Amino acid sequence: LPAFLAGGFLAAAFPVVYMMVKAEEMTALAGNPINILMSANWQMMAMLNILISICGACMMYHTEYADNGMQKMSVLPIRQGSMFFGKFLIAALVLSTMVVIEMAVLVGCAKYWFPSYVFDLTEILKTAGFQIIVTLPTVMLMLVIASACKNMWVSLGIGVILVFTLSILPQDNIVLSLFPFASPYQMLSAAVEN
């Protein structure tokens, strides 16, 4: 858990560093400060979220395959599906925590560098909820991949290849942007426009 929180703080540090370097350019732009900050930083933040989720999924299943833990658990009166759902719930909660940290930092940046910014909780909750929802299929697919591979490095390699392959897909094409490893790069403001 501390590694995931550290990853969330690392992703949240991007808008702060970016605004420290490019504050004049960014504050000169017209529009909603949260949308301005998201469009400038979300691609990198989303990639870090995905990579952290990939590592988490791989580690969850690696601990089960190590020392034949999967075989030992198969004799327990627990269905495999409920164990998968439990892992998905843990991964979703960790992802939600990371996104909440990142959104809090974005709000802090907006309040600090954009004096005219008015805090709107519903907008922040909608944006955070959207980012969590579009990332959950990626987390689910990565858990499926990790459960199918006994070797953690194989599932990690597959996940990283999928991240970098699908991140180059054009985001303006609605069909291509719905693929699980491409969807986390979507932003609510862009989705509303399309």
Q: What do the predicted segments below correspond to?
A:
Residues 18-37, 156-194:
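Terminal transmembrane helical anchor/hairpin motif
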Residues 4-10, 150-167:
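Pore- or pathway-lining transmembrane helices of multi-pass membrane proteins that form conduits
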Residues 79-98, 171-179:
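C-terminal halves and exits of single transmembrane alpha-helices
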Residues 57, 68-69, 141, 180-183:
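Hydrophobic alpha-helical segments typical of transmembrane helices
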Residues 60-92:
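Helix-loop-helix units of permease transmembrane domains in multi-pass membrane transporters
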Residues 4, 8-55, 85-150, 190, ...:
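Secretory targeting signals
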